[in-house]
Amino acid sequence: MKRVHVAAAVIRGSDGRVLIARRPEDKHQGGLWEFPGGKVEDDEPVRAALARELEEELGIRVERARPLIQVRHDYADKHVLLDVWEVDGFSGEAHGVEGQPLAWVEPRELADYEFPAANAPIVQAARLPAHYLITPDGLEPGELISGVRKAVEAGIRLIQLRAPNMFSPEYRDLAIDIQGLCAGKAQLMLKGPLEWLGDFPAAGWHLTSAQLRKYASAGRPFPEGRLLAASCHDAEELALAASMGVEFVTLSPVQPTESHPGEPALGWDKAAELIAGFNQPVYLLGGVGPQQAEQAWEHGAQGVAGIRAFWPGGL
């Protein structure tokens, strides 16, 4: 089967909006929207191909870019690798050099545009931040509320309310308060009974690996349009998550952790290998913090997740 390597860009303006282009009607999947880019030539570095394509298509010069996600997609006649980079620094004013219509879109509104099927993971990656905060165990509700408030004020945009030692009624009350803090500012992910779905319409759900295995055979236990995530530790769990149609996962442990001493860590190379076989955004977890975000990007991850390293004031 023919193999095609494509470099594509999630171009982010200073206001946070993302640039998309509409495909010509006479091309394959014409009329659909896409992320700008083009084919990587033989022996051409991906970043160089990206810079060349964006200058040819949009008249801009790339000044700052980093890996975002790789998506593999099989068509009837070819296998395509979409090598997607986030570009948040460029010079020049973007315009359709070839006459193609362009649009600057708020990330949350990307889902309202029609893209080729292979672009769905890119849309999701463009909407997700690089950091994922998981709340720590053993804190009182007031301490958790205060910490989440500080985290949101500091710019954290994705938060998992994890409180395994709380009884359900206490967790539910806390989730109501935390949802209010996050409204319009951060995406809240809950870890509670799925029967609560209707009571938290703005929240996503993060499945434990045990829940993932429990629900996998029945399919996605969650409405489309709301974020579903899962905790994964190996290739089998990643395959289950993919079959369920999750929007993102955490993959752990990357490195040894204080919370699980003695548990074997994946290591960076194994994590990269697992990510390469998974087409959705992945947050690396376990022994990592904000300072490892760049290393995570280089290994194919969306970013990093953590508890201690992200909690305001530390633990």
Language-model features and meaning:
Residues 133, 151, 159, 197, ...:
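Conserved, mostly hydrophobic/aromatic
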Residues 17-57, 68-70, 187:
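Conserved Nudix-box catalytic region and its N-terminal flanking loop in Nudix hydrolases
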Residues 128-143, 227-232:
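Active-site mouth loops of central-metabolism enzymes
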Residues 172-192, 217-234, 263-289:
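Alpha-helix-loop-beta-strand connector modules within alpha/beta enzyme cores
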Residues 209-218, 248-262, 287-315:
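Glycine-rich phosphate-binding active-site loops on the catalytic face of alpha/beta enzymes
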Residues 1-18, 70:
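Conserved N-terminal beta-strand and adjoining loop/helix that marks the start
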Residues 71-93:
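Active-site-adjacent beta-strand/loop module that shapes the phosphate/pyrophosphate-binding cleft
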Residues 84-86, 94-127:
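NUDIX/MutT-family hydrolases
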